[in-house]
Regions:
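Conserved PLP cofactor-binding pocket of PLP-dependent enzymes
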Residues: 408-429
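Exposed, interaction-prone assembly regions rather than primary DNA-binding/catalytic cores
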Residues: 104-149
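N-terminal basic, amphipathic alpha-helical segments
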Residues: 1-123, 325, 329-336, 363, ...
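Short beta-strand "wing" residues that participate in macromolecule-binding interfaces
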Residues: 66-67, 158, 412
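Conserved glycine-rich beta-strand-loop-beta hairpin in the small C-terminal domain of fold type I
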Residues: 361-369, 379-393
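Conserved core of the PLP fold type I
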Residues: 131-263, 275-276, 280-292
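Short hydrophobic/aromatic beta-strand micro-patches
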Residues: 315, 391-393, 431-433
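Conserved core segment of the aminotransferase class I/II
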Residues: 291-358
Length: 450
């Protein structure tokens, strides 16, 4: 079950511990199961007994295992496992002290075109809606059409009845997961994955299985075996992936779509970053490839425009949209009419916003990479295709680094927060949009804290 567990740049005990966590998290080694004796495990894996002892010891310290005299080492109940020392995405927005440099989130400031549009106001457009009760649970018809037109222009053919407007993409994610996943249901995600998606799945009580994801996208061999177990949902990002900034190659995307269609597993494709490319048009998605009844796309205004306008959407079949609409009515009735009217105006300026974002990110990406090379020359990363962050391998303990950084008032986002298994412990997600002076100050503080 461990497969090629020893592949990787890290020490064998750390690598073995991470592989065991993956098996435990995926349910292959259930709570209460006995692990092989250290000597037997070492012989089977071809490593020293010390390597196994160190891995077992690390997992016992983190609450995954328990050793009982005379009974060996067993998997501890999931309810007793100690959480990794990381903070979720939603936590990061509300618990950062004002005197702290926050490098834990990739959320962007408003694009210039956003300020221009908001200053113009919507007084004339608002007047007819003041004669109504103001509640439009599915979204204003004019915005549903504007989103459909925007998606169609960017390669995702859409009709207005396929769109449900939400109060941001996080609500879109939670509504979708509540409609598909029940307590204890199996849900597949990439590993690493978007923190908000993982939080939504945990909230609905999903049993999450992470599928190894590299610069080439999901490991389709592992995914095929997981799909055979008929999960409730597959959550993925084939366009611009958060946190890695990569995009799935065309051939792999075609293979993935074929697997989804054959399996019949509902698939939630998070497209929130798909138009945040470093250059060129928006990234390709699964929209033309997967059967419409199986695919749900999530989107937002936050990336191109501003997160302060809480506008997101769900794109799905009309039948599924009707189901989601009933859930949405229980959630918060409707999204702000004023924000929706601003959104209509903003979507007309999407090409301008995309050019502004690409220019800003291209400039800041270069200064971010230069600053990181200067302060941490041994850190490495793959060139990104888009998004607002670098997925950086520190080749060390990123959790420990984040704790040290916290003492000098710098907040980091270590890799375990992006993993269903607390994996990627050497990784950091660093935002690329900060001004060079602030970023260099933060990196200098981190350097001094070590």
């Amino acid at each position: 079950m461990l497969g090629d567990w020893s592949d990787g740049p890290h020490a064998l005990p750390e690598t073995l511990a991470a592989a065991l966590v993956s098996l435990i998290g995926a349910g292959f080694v259930p709570a209460g199961s006995a692990l092989p004796a250290q000597r037997d495990c070492a012989t089977a894996l071809g490593v020293s007994r010390g390597t196994v002892a160190a891995a077992y010891g690390a997992l016992e310290a983190r609450g995954y295992l328990v050793s009982v005299q005379g009974s060996g080492t067993r998997v501890r109940s999931g309810s007793n496992q100690a959480p990794a020392l990381v903070e979720g995405r939603l936590f990061s927005f509300t618990h950062t002290p004002v005197d702290t440099i926050d490098l834990s989130t990739g959320a962007l400031p408003a694009s210039p075109v956003t300020g221009e549009v908001l200053r113009e106001g919507v007084e004339e457009e608002l007047a007819p809606y003041l004669e109504t009760d103001g509640y439009f649970p599915a979204g204003l018809p004019v915005l549903r059409q504007a989103v459909a037109d925007h998606l169609s222009r960017t390669g995702i053919p859409t009709q207005a009845q396929q769109v449900l407007i939400t109060s941001g993409s996080q609500q879109a994610t939670f509504l979708t997961m509540r409609s598909l996943v029940g307590q204890g249901d199996l849900a597949l995600t990439e590993d690493p994955s978007y923190r908000g998606g993982l939080e939504a799945l945990r909230t609905v009580g999903a049993r999450i299985e992470g599928i190894r994801t590299t610069r080439e996208g999901l490991d389709l061999g592992l995914l095929a075996r997981a799909l055979a177990r008929k999960p409730a949902v597959l959550y993925c990002q084939t366009g611009i992936h958060n946190p890695t900034g990569q995009t799935m190659p065309h051939g792999a995307r075609l293979d993935l779509a074929t697997m989804i269609n054959r399996s019949g597993v509902p698939t939630v494709e998070d497209c929130c970053s798909y138009d945040l490319t470093v250059s060129g048009p928006p990234a390709t998605t699964l929209a033309r490839l997967v059967e419409p009844e199986l695919l749900i796309n999530l989107g937002t205004l936050s990336k191109l425009f501003w997160g302060g306008l809480r506008i997101g959407w769900i794109r799905a079949s009309p039948t599924r949209i009707r189901t989601l609409l009933e859930l949405r009515k229980v959630e918060d009735l409707a999204t702000s009419v004023i924000d929706q009217l601003h959104a209509v105006s903003l979507l007309r300026r999407a090409p301008d916003a995309r050019r502004q974002r690409q220019a800003m990110l291209a400039s800041h990406l270069k200064t971010t990479e230069d600053a990181v090379h200067e302060h941490f020359p041994h850190w490495t990363w793959d060139p990104i295709k888009g998004g607002s962050g670098l997925w950086v391998d520190t080749h060390g303990d990123a959790l420990a680094l984040a704790e040290m950084a916290k003492r000098v008032k710098v907040k980091l986002a270590p890799g375990p927060g992006f993993s269903p298994y607390d994996g990627h412990r050497s990784m950091l997600r660093l935002p690329v949009w900060h001004e060079p002076e602030l970023l260099r100050q933060a990196l200098q503080l981190i350097t001094g804290s070590k």
